[in-house]
Amino acid sequence: IALAAGDVSATDTVMLAPIPSNAAIVTIKLFNDDLDSGTTNTCDVGVYSESNGTFTALDDDAYASAITDLRAAVGGVGTDVTYEARNINTTGQRVWEDAGQTSDPGGYLFIGLLFDAAGDTAGDLSFVIEYVVN
């Protein structure tokens, strides 16, 4: 994803991918350019629903909360953020459960980033999300 400086301002969201609501997330890895002009950028990784092009946070920090990993370039094996905020006891839990829902809404939910504090630097963000559906 090519991000403009204005895409990483405080309260901005960036959707990564739609995931079947009944899938279990195995890994969320981020690879990125330095997206911070200083040392202020923080973001959450969470679950969102979508209706008519509008995204709503179900749990905006289900996987990661206030991470600082986008402050410097990350290549190689990337940064695994799957369990930064998520308890390892939830391994195998479905995305709808990660989102705090009481039942499976069906369809797709989205994995997205919410920028808590601005980085305001343009750059690229790549990701790998591995999941299983049983």
Regions found by a protein language model. Give the residues of each.
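Surface-exposed, low-hydrophobicity beta-strand/loop segments enriched in small/polar/acidic residues
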Residues: 1-134
